[in-house]
Amino acid sequence: MGKTAKHSDEVTDEMWNEVNPFNRDMVQEFLENQTHLSKKSLVQYESGLRIYFYWVKENLNNKQCVEIKKKEYLKYQNYLTRRGLSESAIKFKKSCVSAFNNYIMFMYEDEYPTFRNYVTSEMKVVSTGYVHEKQPLTPNEYIKLCKALEDKEDYQKLAYVMFSYSTGCRRAEARQLLKEVIVD
């Protein structure tokens, strides 16, 4: 098993308010126009972009997003690697910034004709060897959770917990379960 990865620090609303207003407004507009993303994906994109632009505030003098260059973005990516984030976390943050840049290129072509997406496929994410350690429920935690759900009469969640715990299936696999296959 690899080394345990660190989690990104959350950017609070207070910290976010210190970020260049132009960048904050552009992020907000970008998120509002991502109608193809689920609510959970939007939350992740918002978090990834907040982390990035707070880093820009701290390390690039709060530069506007349309002025950032490739070498400056690479410093951010190296910062994430040095912090001990997992490879998948770094790739996701890279994807957020790239999607944001593509949005600017498409929507603001007239206003910023020389702007290009500075996040490119040539920028490889270093394999860090860091992973997030999975912490399965202990038998006592499982019993306590089942008891709490039963006390709340939340039988659907109780059935899900019992099924997934006893079979070891993943969330996506559990969704595929059909009532027709359950035998009395």
Describe the residue ranges of each PLM region:
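Alpha-helix N-cap/helix-start motif at helix boundaries, enriched for small hydrophobics
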Residues: 45, 97, 160, 168, ...
